[in-house]
Amino acid sequence: LKQNIYDNDIFYQAYLDLRLNSTGLNDVLEIPAFRSLLPENLTGMRILDLGCGFGQACSRYASQGAAKVIGVDISKKMISRAKQIYRHENIEYVCLPIEDIGFPREEFDLVLSSLAFHYIADLKNVLERILYCLKNNGFLIFSQEHPVATAKQIPDGWCKNENGEKMHWILDDYNDEGIRKQNWLIKDVIKYHRTMSTIMNTLIGCGFKIVKVLEPTPIKEAEIINKDLKNERRRPPFLMIKAQKGQSSTHSCRRERV
């Protein structure tokens, strides 16, 4: 199942409004933490951005000297906006499901993905495809919703008191992997829950070496900007992993060019 909720008009507009608000979790937590995992110097690199969305990150990588940036997203609306707003001679945008990428062998120095992997049903398939098009010793860096956040099988994971105050986060059904339907901007958004060990062991089994793992939480100063962030210190909202392809990694990904 390849889900394309971002071309839903209601969802798209709600998401656009969310991203235009620079005090949300993406801007004050996910993006800074993700950037901390990137190489200091992107000059001359060939970069693949999976789930590129509006293309902001692609534009940033190109402006920092990347020789080529390819942004992939399943959403026609996202790709259209990216082409309009974040054009650059070193950027190419491709409207394609992440699950269907088929770039040439050892094409990229760096493969990046921000908050997209929890929408993917077959993680192993995607990792094999990434491994194939990643150069030896190249890096995969990705973020996703934390397994603690995706485990619940109810729409809202917070247990609240009679006044609606958030008392604690419900952690249940952690080892029951698979589809989750959650209410986020619209009802019944499909995500895929995997345990921490499944995510890491799938990476290792595909031939990656895990270099660094982050479970970022907001700094207290950020709560001044957004008071709701104090609740995000009570459980990890995001998981971020930096993994490296070794010299002896096998290649089982399809070889056709998109």
Predicted regions and their residues:
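Conserved class I S-adenosyl-L-methionine
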Residues: L1-L42, Q56-R60, R81, I141-G178
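Class I SAM-dependent methyltransferase SAM/SAH-binding core
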Residues: L48-L50, F54-D100
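A short acidic, Gly/Pro-enriched loop at the edge of an enzyme's catalytic core
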Residues: G102-V111
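A short SAM/SAH-binding and catalytic strip from SAM-dependent methyltransferases
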Residues: L110-L123
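A short glycine-rich, Lys/Arg-flanked "PGG" loop and its adjoining helix->strand segment in the class I
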Residues: K124-F139
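Acceptor-substrate binding/catalytic loop of class I
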Residues: Q144, V148-A151, N183-S197
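Short alpha-helix
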Residues: I179, K191-V213
